[in-house]
Amino acid sequence: MARGPKKHLKRLNAPKAWMLDKLGGVYAPRPSTGPHKLRESLPLVIFLRNRLKYALTNSEVTKIVMQRLIKVDGKVRTDPNYPSGFMDVITIEKTGEFFRLIYDVKGRFTIHRITAEEAKYKLCKVKRVQTGPKGIPFLVTHDGRTIRYPDPIIKVNDTIQLEIANSKIMDSIKFDSGNLCMITGGRNLGRVGTVVNRERHPGSFDIVHIKDSQGHTFANRLNNVFIIGKGSKAYVSLPRGKGVKLSIAEERDKRLAAKTH
Protein backbone atom coordinates (compact mmCIF):
# COMPACT_ATOMS: atom_id res chain seq x y z
CA MET A 1 0.00 0.00 0.00
CA ALA A 2 1.40 3.40 -0.98
CA ARG A 3 1.80 5.73 1.96
CA GLY A 4 2.40 9.44 1.77
CA PRO A 5 2.87 11.74 -1.18
CA LYS A 6 4.27 10.70 -4.53
CA LYS A 7 7.84 11.90 -4.91
CA HIS A 8 8.66 10.94 -8.48
CA LEU A 9 7.34 11.66 -11.95
CA LYS A 10 8.22 9.43 -14.88
CA ARG A 11 9.28 11.26 -18.00
CA LEU A 12 6.64 9.62 -20.17
CA ASN A 13 3.95 10.69 -17.72
CA ALA A 14 5.09 14.34 -17.61
CA PRO A 15 2.81 16.87 -19.34
CA LYS A 16 3.44 17.06 -23.10
CA ALA A 17 3.55 20.86 -22.80
CA TRP A 18 6.92 20.59 -21.02
CA MET A 19 8.40 19.23 -24.27
CA LEU A 20 10.82 16.81 -22.61
CA ASP A 21 12.44 14.31 -24.94
CA LYS A 22 11.48 10.69 -24.29
CA LEU A 23 15.04 9.41 -24.24
CA GLY A 24 16.50 12.05 -21.95
CA GLY A 25 16.31 9.83 -18.87
CA VAL A 26 13.68 7.94 -16.90
CA TYR A 27 12.39 10.70 -14.63
CA ALA A 28 11.18 14.27 -14.94
CA PRO A 29 11.25 16.95 -12.22
CA ARG A 30 8.10 16.59 -10.14
CA PRO A 31 6.66 20.02 -9.29
CA SER A 32 6.35 20.78 -5.59
CA THR A 33 2.94 21.45 -4.14
CA GLY A 34 1.99 25.04 -4.79
CA PRO A 35 -0.52 27.43 -6.31
CA HIS A 36 -0.93 25.58 -9.62
CA LYS A 37 -1.91 22.00 -10.41
CA LEU A 38 0.80 19.56 -11.48
CA ARG A 39 -0.54 19.19 -15.03
CA GLU A 40 -1.03 22.94 -15.45
CA SER A 41 2.32 24.14 -14.15
CA LEU A 42 5.92 24.48 -15.27
CA PRO A 43 8.68 23.86 -12.68
CA LEU A 44 11.36 26.56 -12.54
CA VAL A 45 14.02 23.97 -13.40
CA ILE A 46 12.42 23.31 -16.80
CA PHE A 47 11.96 27.02 -17.47
CA LEU A 48 15.58 27.91 -16.66
CA ARG A 49 17.30 24.81 -18.05
CA ASN A 50 15.21 23.60 -21.00
CA ARG A 51 13.62 26.85 -22.16
CA LEU A 52 16.06 29.67 -21.39
CA LYS A 53 19.18 27.43 -21.45
CA TYR A 54 20.64 29.37 -18.51
CA ALA A 55 21.80 26.10 -16.96
CA LEU A 56 22.84 22.71 -18.26
CA THR A 57 21.92 20.53 -15.29
CA ASN A 58 19.52 20.42 -12.39
CA SER A 59 22.30 21.18 -9.90
CA GLU A 60 23.21 24.35 -11.84
CA VAL A 61 19.56 25.47 -11.59
CA THR A 62 19.69 24.84 -7.84
CA LYS A 63 22.79 27.05 -7.60
CA ILE A 64 20.98 29.83 -9.50
CA VAL A 65 17.79 29.75 -7.41
CA MET A 66 19.68 29.48 -4.13
CA GLN A 67 21.36 32.81 -4.90
CA ARG A 68 17.83 34.27 -4.63
CA LEU A 69 17.96 35.58 -8.19
CA ILE A 70 14.59 34.28 -9.39
CA LYS A 71 11.29 35.85 -8.38
CA VAL A 72 7.85 34.48 -9.21
CA ASP A 73 5.07 37.05 -8.79
CA GLY A 74 7.43 39.33 -6.87
CA LYS A 75 8.50 36.70 -4.31
CA VAL A 76 11.93 35.06 -4.27
CA ARG A 77 11.60 31.32 -4.91
CA THR A 78 14.51 29.05 -4.01
CA ASP A 79 12.81 25.75 -4.86
CA PRO A 80 13.92 24.52 -8.32
CA ASN A 81 10.69 22.50 -8.58
CA TYR A 82 8.41 25.44 -7.70
CA PRO A 83 5.28 25.16 -9.90
CA SER A 84 4.87 28.40 -11.81
CA GLY A 85 1.72 28.49 -13.93
CA PHE A 86 -0.52 30.44 -16.29
CA MET A 87 -0.18 34.25 -15.99
CA ASP A 88 2.69 34.07 -13.47
CA VAL A 89 5.38 36.74 -13.84
CA ILE A 90 8.94 35.41 -13.55
CA THR A 91 11.56 38.08 -12.85
CA ILE A 92 15.33 37.68 -13.19
CA GLU A 93 16.64 40.95 -11.77
CA LYS A 94 20.29 40.25 -12.48
CA THR A 95 19.65 40.23 -16.24
CA GLY A 96 16.73 42.69 -16.08
CA GLU A 97 14.37 40.19 -17.71
CA PHE A 98 10.67 39.68 -17.12
CA PHE A 99 8.58 36.79 -18.44
CA ARG A 100 4.89 35.97 -18.30
CA LEU A 101 3.89 32.33 -18.58
CA ILE A 102 1.33 32.14 -21.39
CA TYR A 103 0.31 29.27 -23.67
CA ASP A 104 1.01 29.30 -27.39
CA VAL A 105 -1.61 27.89 -29.78
CA LYS A 106 0.03 24.46 -29.61
CA GLY A 107 -0.80 24.43 -25.89
CA ARG A 108 2.75 24.84 -24.60
CA PHE A 109 4.16 27.41 -22.19
CA THR A 110 6.05 29.88 -24.34
CA ILE A 111 8.94 32.19 -23.39
CA HIS A 112 7.05 35.46 -23.47
CA ARG A 113 9.21 38.45 -22.53
CA ILE A 114 7.39 41.48 -21.14
CA THR A 115 8.31 45.02 -20.11
CA ALA A 116 9.03 46.04 -16.53
CA GLU A 117 5.81 48.07 -16.61
CA GLU A 118 3.70 45.04 -17.56
CA ALA A 119 5.46 42.88 -14.98
CA LYS A 120 3.84 44.91 -12.18
CA TYR A 121 0.48 43.20 -12.56
CA LYS A 122 -1.10 39.89 -13.50
CA LEU A 123 -4.57 38.65 -14.37
CA CYS A 124 -6.34 36.17 -12.11
CA LYS A 125 -9.56 34.30 -12.80
CA VAL A 126 -12.05 34.32 -9.93
CA LYS A 127 -12.85 30.74 -8.91
CA ARG A 128 -14.95 31.35 -5.81
CA VAL A 129 -16.69 34.24 -4.06
CA GLN A 130 -18.04 33.66 -0.57
CA THR A 131 -18.42 35.05 2.92
CA GLY A 132 -15.98 33.98 5.61
CA PRO A 133 -16.15 34.08 9.40
CA LYS A 134 -17.65 37.28 10.89
CA GLY A 135 -19.27 38.02 7.54
CA ILE A 136 -16.05 39.03 5.76
CA PRO A 137 -16.47 38.56 1.99
CA PHE A 138 -13.53 37.10 0.07
CA LEU A 139 -12.70 35.68 -3.32
CA VAL A 140 -10.34 32.89 -4.38
CA THR A 141 -8.39 33.09 -7.65
CA HIS A 142 -7.07 30.44 -10.05
CA ASP A 143 -3.60 30.70 -8.48
CA GLY A 144 -4.80 30.06 -4.94
CA ARG A 145 -4.88 33.65 -3.68
CA THR A 146 -7.49 34.74 -1.16
CA ILE A 147 -8.44 38.41 -1.40
CA ARG A 148 -10.67 39.90 1.30
CA TYR A 149 -13.23 42.66 0.86
CA PRO A 150 -13.40 42.57 -2.96
CA ASP A 151 -15.71 44.83 -4.96
CA PRO A 152 -19.21 43.27 -4.70
CA ILE A 153 -19.69 43.44 -8.50
CA ILE A 154 -16.92 40.84 -9.01
CA LYS A 155 -18.46 37.41 -9.61
CA VAL A 156 -17.18 33.89 -10.34
CA ASN A 157 -15.51 33.50 -13.80
CA ASP A 158 -14.68 37.22 -13.96
CA THR A 159 -11.02 38.23 -14.20
CA ILE A 160 -9.25 40.64 -11.86
CA GLN A 161 -6.15 42.68 -12.65
CA LEU A 162 -3.95 42.26 -9.59
CA GLU A 163 -1.07 44.51 -8.59
CA ILE A 164 1.68 42.05 -7.67
CA ALA A 165 3.56 44.22 -5.15
CA ASN A 166 0.68 44.56 -2.67
CA SER A 167 -1.98 42.11 -3.94
CA LYS A 168 -4.49 44.90 -4.56
CA ILE A 169 -7.20 44.63 -7.20
CA MET A 170 -6.54 47.31 -9.84
CA ASP A 171 -9.41 46.49 -12.19
CA SER A 172 -11.90 43.74 -13.00
CA ILE A 173 -13.24 42.38 -16.29
CA LYS A 174 -16.71 40.86 -16.40
CA PHE A 175 -17.37 37.52 -18.08
CA ASP A 176 -19.47 38.95 -20.91
CA SER A 177 -20.01 38.25 -24.57
CA GLY A 178 -17.80 40.49 -26.70
CA ASN A 179 -14.83 40.28 -24.31
CA LEU A 180 -11.47 38.79 -25.27
CA CYS A 181 -10.59 35.42 -23.76
CA MET A 182 -7.88 32.76 -23.82
CA ILE A 183 -8.48 29.02 -23.55
CA THR A 184 -6.58 27.37 -20.70
CA GLY A 185 -7.49 23.71 -21.18
CA GLY A 186 -8.69 21.14 -23.69
CA ARG A 187 -7.87 20.80 -27.37
CA ASN A 188 -8.19 24.55 -28.08
CA LEU A 189 -5.59 25.35 -25.41
CA GLY A 190 -3.85 28.67 -26.07
CA ARG A 191 -6.36 30.03 -28.58
CA VAL A 192 -7.57 33.61 -28.19
CA GLY A 193 -10.95 34.92 -29.33
CA THR A 194 -13.99 36.93 -28.32
CA VAL A 195 -16.85 35.36 -26.39
CA VAL A 196 -19.93 35.00 -28.62
CA ASN A 197 -22.38 33.44 -26.18
CA ARG A 198 -22.66 31.09 -23.21
CA GLU A 199 -24.95 28.05 -23.17
CA ARG A 200 -26.10 27.19 -19.68
CA HIS A 201 -26.48 23.50 -18.85
CA PRO A 202 -27.59 23.14 -15.21
CA GLY A 203 -26.07 20.02 -13.68
CA SER A 204 -23.55 19.73 -16.49
CA PHE A 205 -20.85 21.92 -18.02
CA ASP A 206 -21.70 25.34 -19.44
CA ILE A 207 -20.45 25.70 -23.02
CA VAL A 208 -18.94 28.96 -24.27
CA HIS A 209 -18.81 29.75 -28.00
CA ILE A 210 -15.80 31.77 -29.10
CA LYS A 211 -14.78 33.45 -32.34
CA ASP A 212 -11.15 34.30 -33.15
CA SER A 213 -9.81 37.22 -35.19
CA GLN A 214 -9.76 35.09 -38.37
CA GLY A 215 -13.48 34.36 -38.03
CA HIS A 216 -13.07 30.71 -36.94
CA THR A 217 -15.56 29.68 -34.25
CA PHE A 218 -15.02 27.01 -31.60
CA ALA A 219 -16.64 25.98 -28.33
CA ASN A 220 -15.17 25.21 -24.94
CA ARG A 221 -16.20 24.45 -21.40
CA LEU A 222 -16.70 27.46 -19.21
CA ASN A 223 -14.02 26.49 -16.69
CA ASN A 224 -11.37 26.51 -19.47
CA VAL A 225 -12.18 30.07 -20.57
CA PHE A 226 -10.03 32.85 -19.09
CA ILE A 227 -11.09 36.45 -19.89
CA ILE A 228 -8.01 38.54 -20.76
CA GLY A 229 -9.46 41.83 -22.04
CA LYS A 230 -12.40 44.17 -22.46
CA GLY A 231 -13.76 44.25 -26.01
CA SER A 232 -10.86 43.52 -28.34
CA LYS A 233 -8.25 45.18 -26.09
CA ALA A 234 -6.11 42.64 -24.23
CA TYR A 235 -4.84 43.60 -20.76
CA VAL A 236 -1.65 41.57 -21.30
CA SER A 237 0.62 41.35 -24.33
CA LEU A 238 0.15 38.13 -26.30
CA PRO A 239 2.89 35.88 -27.73
CA ARG A 240 3.71 35.66 -31.42
CA GLY A 241 0.70 34.59 -33.48
CA LYS A 242 -1.69 36.39 -31.08
CA GLY A 243 -3.44 33.13 -30.19
CA VAL A 244 -4.75 32.42 -33.70
CA LYS A 245 -4.56 28.73 -34.57
CA LEU A 246 -3.87 28.05 -38.23
CA SER A 247 -5.11 24.93 -39.98
CA ILE A 248 -2.47 22.49 -41.26
CA ALA A 249 -2.89 23.81 -44.82
CA GLU A 250 -2.55 27.43 -43.66
CA GLU A 251 0.59 26.57 -41.70
CA ARG A 252 2.07 24.90 -44.79
CA ASP A 253 1.30 27.93 -46.99
CA LYS A 254 2.87 30.22 -44.41
CA ARG A 255 6.04 28.12 -44.30
CA LEU A 256 6.28 28.05 -48.10
CA ALA A 257 5.77 31.81 -48.29
CA ALA A 258 8.55 32.32 -45.74
CA LYS A 259 10.90 30.11 -47.81
CA THR A 260 10.28 31.97 -51.07
CA HIS A 261 11.07 35.39 -49.54
UniProtKB/Swiss-Prot annotation:
Q: Which GO terms describe its molecular function?
A: rRNA binding; structural constituent of ribosome
List, alphabetically, the InterPro entries matched: KOW, Rib_uL2_dom2, Ribosomal_eS4, Ribosomal_eS4_C, Ribosomal_eS4_central_region, Ribosomal_eS4_central_sf, Ribosomal_eS4_KOW, Ribosomal_eS4_N
Start and end residues of each S4 RNA-binding domain: 42-104
Q: What GO terms describe the biological role, i.e. biological process, of this protein?
A: translation
- Give the SMART domains listed for this entry: S4
GO cellular component, alphabetical, reads: cytosolic small ribosomal subunit
UniProt keyword annotations, A-Z: Ribonucleoprotein, Ribosomal protein, RNA-binding, rRNA-binding
PROSITE patterns reported in the protein's UniProt record: RIBOSOMAL_S4E, S4
Query: Entry's Pfam families?
Result: 40S_S4_C (PF16121), KOW (PF00467), Ribosomal_S4e (PF00900), RS4NT (PF08071), S4 (PF01479)
Q: Which Gene3D superfamilies does the protein's record reference?
A: 2.30.30.30, 2.40.50.740, RNA-binding S4 domain
Family affiliation: Belongs to the eukaryotic ribosomal protein eS4 family.
PANTHER family given for it?
30S/40S RIBOSOMAL PROTEIN S4 (PTHR11581), SMALL RIBOSOMAL SUBUNIT PROTEIN ES4 (PTHR11581:SF0)
Record's protein name: Small ribosomal subunit protein eS4
Q: Which organism is it from?
A: Carabus granulatus (Ground beetle)
Gene that this polypeptide is encoded by: RpS4
